[in-house]
């Protein structure tokens, strides 16, 4: 039972132009979706790595962690519930929105939304970086790292 990689990140922000510019020109991401309330980006063959929700706040919306096996979702849900953390099973329509086969979600003690996802979808179209880039490796390694600030009393 293992968490394999940081699969995707969601940010609450209504500054779509700023995020579009920054993600493509600075991070080299490919913008893949733009709607009234959502902005999405790729950084490899995975369908979606970064989502801007359109909600006000300019803060973390969610962190999505990939698990190795579908059974890992039940394993982690059980562990969390034993520690009195409320876990939710996502409906298939919600999993589709995240481009994963299945997922559970919960809030950490600081109130950050954490999602554990199984089998992220790949895109059949090749990744097209937003700027010239080389040596860009993600894939099975995921997005990299995430640092989440917590109150000192939480440590």
Regions found by a protein language model. Give the residues of each.
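Core segments of cupin and vicinal oxygen chelate
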Residues: 1-48, 149-155
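Short amphipathic beta-strand starts and helix->beta connectors
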Residues: 46-50, 129-131
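Short acidic/glycine-enriched loop/turn segments that link adjacent beta-strands
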Residues: 35-38, 59, 97-100
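Active-site beta-strand termini and strand-to-loop segments that position acidic
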Residues: 41-46, 55, 106-109
